[in-house]
Amino acid sequence: MAKKPKSVKDTNNMVVASNRKARHNYSILETYEAGVALVGTEVKSLRDGTASLADAFATVDDGEIWLRNLHIPEYHHGSWTNHAPRRNRKLLMHRREIDNLVGKIRDGNLTLVPLSLYFTGGKVKVELALARGKQAHDKRQDMARRDAQREVTRELGRRVKGMTN
């Protein structure tokens, strides 16, 4: 059986983009997986590994979830049929999930933030988070907690090294 050449990328389980600032600016309550309705040149551009979730967010309009401000650059081999880089893209979820999300968003002053964009079995998926925005003092508390944890880990490492020497 012939093997694939090593130069060919396996895009079946590839993370295309991740929103690293989302975990800093929001406290994540729940995560969901949704499909993304795309056109052909968008998928080809994503297979090149170029996309930006930096300013992206999701909204609910007329019972449908839309991903806004996701930047997928134009496909470099595309012609006049190329897509608009920042167009609104429909997210594909079950009706029960959408209704559940709408209720939670309205009740708890929450928002939908995309965390990552990836391929699963040839299909493009987005990991959405139901999140609440952090204020400045929340961010400072998180930083202090991480610093304290880092100090504990460092001290434990020193003690273990001291015992083995």
UniProtKB/Swiss-Prot annotation:
Main location, first listed in the record: cytoplasm
InterPro entries: SmpB, SsrA-bd_prot, SsrA-bd_prot_CS
GO MF annotation: an example: RNA binding
Compositional bias annotation for Basic and acidic residues: 135-158
Name by which UniProt lists this protein: SsrA-binding protein
Cytoplasm is among the record's keywords: yes
Region (Disordered): 135-165
Function: Required for rescue of stalled ribosomes mediated by trans-translation. Binds to transfer-messenger RNA (tmRNA), required for stable association of tmRNA with ribosomes. tmRNA and SmpB together mimic tRNA shape, replacing the anticodon stem-loop with SmpB. tmRNA is encoded by the ssrA gene; the 2 termini fold to resemble tRNA(Ala) and it encodes a 'tag peptide', a short internal open reading frame. During trans-translation Ala-aminoacylated tmRNA acts like a tRNA, entering the A-site of stalled ribosomes, displacing the stalled mRNA.
Family statement: Belongs to the SmpB family.
PROSITE patterns: SSRP (PS01317)
Keywords from the named record: Cytoplasm, RNA-binding
Subcellular location: Cytoplasm
Pfam families: SmpB
Cytoplasm keyword on record: yes
Gene encoding the protein: smpB
GO biological process: trans-translation
Gene Ontology CC annotations of this record: cytosol
